[in-house]
Amino acid sequence: MTKVEIHENVQEIFRDVFDEEDIVITDKTNAEDIEDWDSLAQVRLTVAIEKKFGIKFDFGELTALHNVGEMLELIEKKIAG
């Protein structure tokens, strides 16, 4: 799966979780940029991403992330094995 495909899939997950069809994420997007991105939304995002890509995050990996770009890089690494 290419970086673009990963981004497109994560974009759709964000739209589903936040129930906002026009939401646009960039590598620099973080929790402060999306009004409803709270701890519950983070859990929903994490579960949806893990399910979509067939991967598992550990707590340390998640707490180290600062923005969507870092999340996309982590997903790419996990998919690659």
Segments predicted by a language model, with ranges:
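Phosphopantetheine-dependent thiolation modules in NRPS/PKS and related acyl-activating systems
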Residues: 2-81
